[in-house]
Swiss-Prot record:
Pathway: Amino-acid biosynthesis; L-leucine biosynthesis; L-leucine from 3-methyl-2-oxobutanoate: step 3/4. Its cofactor is Mg(2+); Mn(2+). Catalyzes the oxidation of 3-carboxy-2-hydroxy-4-methylpentanoate (3-isopropylmalate) to 3-carboxy-4-methyl-2-oxopentanoate. The product decarboxylates to 4-methyl-2 oxopentanoate. The modification Phosphoserine is found at S71. This is 3-isopropylmalate dehydrogenase, chloroplastic. Binds 1 Mg(2+) or Mn(2+) ion per subunit. Mg(2+) binds at D265, D289, D293. Substrate binds at R137, R147, R175, D265.
Amino acid sequence: MAAALQTNIRPVKFPATLRALTKQSSPAPFRVRCAAASPGKKRYNITLLPGDGIGPEVISIAKNVLQQAGSLEGLEFSFQEMPVGGAALDLVGVPLPEETVSAAKESDAVLLGAIGGYKWDKNEKHLKPETGLLQLRAGLKVFANLRPATVLPQLVDASTLKREVAEGVDLMVVRELTGGIYFGVPRGIKTNENGEEVGYNTEVYAAHEIDRIARVAFETARKRRGKLCSVDKANVLDASILWRRRVTALAAEYPDVELSHMYVDNAAMQLVRDPKQFDTIVTNNIFGDILSDEASMITGSIGMLPSASLSDSGPGLFEPIHGSAPDIAGQDKANPLATILSAAMLLKYGLGEEKAAKRIEDAVLGALNKGFRTGDIYSAGTKLVGCKEMGEEVLKSVDSHVQASV
């Protein structure tokens, strides 16, 4: 069985302002919760984790967009901002305070900015910002990571692939997040009988772990174009033989979804040769880690890519895939679109509010259609803008809600 990650979350004494925040009331945790609100409106509690580097900048903008799109669709949001990562280390000495975990668990969804920075690189492992993120995922029991990779027509020339290969790419990688070789036991480094050091890890998957990620993938494919490719290494690995067997058996419950199988080495090649053949990909932890990063580069900029991590019943964790970019933090240079699109995923996959999610997605396309670009996606003939102005343009498009061309 996959070993559980030790959280080592410690209670800390917050400054008065943060203690006041943690006293806000929230409903008991379960998937897609809705508290009482104004007549005709639904209310959701959202925990915001700005984190480090450019995180606070992009979270501030995404919050405004989320609030505006929600209000236009009859939704009300109550936001609670909590520290995590390096910001929490500086504030209270640990990367994930117990109060942050409690707030996240009691919310309907969690929106994260970014984690990490040079400042904390030399910290011991348990005091690194990234440890806080791993602990948060473990605390929320998220097991399914959804990462879309879409080449928008406005940005097709930013892709490293030829236009005819990149144009029209729209795929989703569904990665199992808590099992496999990253968590399997036994693991370690030891000295063998010859006195030589040996490092070893174990790829382990139980049937229920495969079944639950496969269900997420089938449901995701059903909402997209109805095609699911399961990626494994069943010609070599026993764990992959079981993976393929379980996914194939589950396909009987989804006759409307076309299932195919592909070995991971071939999948890695096909992603750059003909990425348009893929709709939804489901795979294990380590293969998903690699393939999702590969797929992200097809789009041309990680500043455009959101992600969602889902659990069986509790709140999901939504975040851009880019890092904290401390070298541009506070300079109004960050691209907020990945975080804005993460807010759209929060609405769609976390709360089931697809109309509000579509409003945000259309607004992003609307701003791009008008030619606005941050530095990472800028090209000749477009208008270079900063983080704040890009956010303002998306907000304008949310208000107008003109169906954007794709």
